[in-house]
């Protein structure tokens, strides 16, 4: 019996000796990727709170610059024709001006491009909230076969072959391999600088300038806040010291009903599988809303007037319609004032967020 045990033990030893060694990543948890440069402050403009920043991705000048370059670079798509900015461009309030976005090889998305402007304040990203952070959001479109049609590995391989990019990654994160985690963190750092406030509303509401808004916009603000009128602030929130104009929650308005009266897009339900979330979509911010037509998650409303008229009608009735969506009793003047107020939410666009890959035309004297 002892001899048999010895042979078994010897066999186990030989088996273990022949087995492949565990990968380094399996032996030791991978060290977190973190920028190495000096942390910079992202200053929030009038009307907005401090910008939320994750502990593992503090903003640095190097990561912001790298993220800005990546954001505008078509290298992140399979045929190099689509960049992040293709669907989220400053000329359209960091959307794209289309009902649904164009993808690679003639593909079409199924939803309106969410605005990137002030997305730093969203607790969940995408219309359905499937990404918990800007970093995770930056992972999605690249690998979507319709949007950018690439793989994370393919992006990394392409960037490794670019000596300029490799040097910029090393400068931002320290010497080491280029990874998609670094790509996502750089893009997210840049997007946290894409914030806009100091609008006529902000100067009126928080800056003490009572002449900053027109009389029509001031009347529209009252319609916006009044629960018996627009009741808009119920979801598009205004706080004492700042205004995000979003409750960061999900609501069913009945947008996107098909000819059979069915919801064509299940929205938040696809993530939660909770019946109450059927057809519910994230409340978008209204900041710079005048710049980002068309509207709603499917881009079905071309103008702010169409949006207001939709709410006046009480949305589209369905089993899961949000309890706060009710027909509004607004006069034509109140409707027009409400639109004028929303136009007063157009804020100051910060410098340094346009395409760094495009050389500015020389100014002729």
Task: Enumerate the language-model features and the residues they cover.
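Short glycine/threonine-rich turn/loop motifs
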Residues: 28-140, 202-302, 306-312, 316-319, ...
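Short, conserved catalytic or interaction motifs in soluble domains
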Residues: 20-21
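C-terminal capping alpha-helices of c-type cytochrome domains
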Residues: 152-197, 290, 300-365
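A gly/proline- and charged-residue-enriched helix-loop-helix capping module
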Residues: 145-149
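Bacterial N-terminal signal peptides that target proteins for export
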Residues: 1-8
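Low-complexity, intrinsically disordered segments with a bias for serine/threonine
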Residues: 10-13
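Generic hydrophobic/packing signal
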Residues: 120-123, 138-142, 159, 163, ...
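C-terminal motif of bacterial Sec signal peptides marking the signal peptidase cleavage site
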Residues: 16-17
């Amino acid at each position: 019996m002892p001899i048999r045990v010895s042979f078994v033990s010897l066999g186990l030893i030989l088996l273990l000796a022949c087995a492949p060694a565990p990968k380094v990543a399996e032996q030791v948890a991978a060290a977190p990727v973190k920028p190495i440069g000096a942390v910079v402050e992202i200053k929030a403009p009038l009307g907005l709170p401090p910008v939320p920043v994750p502990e593992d991705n503090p903003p640095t000048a190097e990561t912001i610059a790298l993220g800005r370059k990546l954001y505008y670079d078509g290298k992140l798509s399979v045929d190099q024709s689509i960049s992040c900015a293709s669907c989220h461009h400053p000329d359209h309030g960091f959307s794209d001006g289309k009902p649904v976005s164009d993808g690679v090889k003639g593909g079409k998305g199924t939803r309106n491009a969410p605005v990137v402007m002030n997305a730093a304040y969203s607790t969940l990203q995408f219309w359905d909230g499937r990404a918990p952070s800007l970093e995770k959001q930056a992972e999605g479109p690249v690998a979507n076969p319709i949007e950018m049609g690439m793989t994370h590995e393919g992006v990394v391989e392409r960037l490794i072959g670019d000596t300029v990019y490799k040097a910029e990654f090393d400068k931002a994160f320290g010497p080491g391999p280029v990874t998609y985690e670094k790509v996502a963190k750089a893009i997210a750092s840049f997007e946290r600088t894409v914030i806009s406030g100091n609008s006529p509303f902000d100067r009126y509401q928080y800056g003490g300038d009572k002449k900053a808004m027109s009389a029509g916009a001031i009347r529209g603000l009252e319609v916006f806040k009044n629960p018996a009128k627009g009741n808009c602030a119920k979801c598009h929130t205004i706080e004492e010291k700042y205004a995000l104009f979003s409750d960061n929650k999900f609501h069913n308005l009945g947008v996107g009903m098909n000819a059979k009266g069915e919801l064509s897009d299940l929205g938040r339900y696809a993530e939660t599988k909770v019946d109450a979330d059927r057809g519910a979509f994230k409340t978008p911010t209204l900041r710079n809303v005048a710049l980002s037509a068309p509207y709603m998650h499917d881009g079905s409303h071309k103008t702010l007037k169409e949006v207001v008229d939709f709410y006046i009608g009480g949305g589209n009735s369905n089993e899961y319609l949000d309890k706060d969506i009710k027909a509004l009793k607004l006069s034509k003047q109140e409707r027009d004032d409400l639109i004028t107020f929303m136009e007063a939410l157009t804020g100051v666009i910060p410098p340094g967020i346009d395409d760094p890959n495009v050389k500015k035309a020389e100014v002729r004297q």
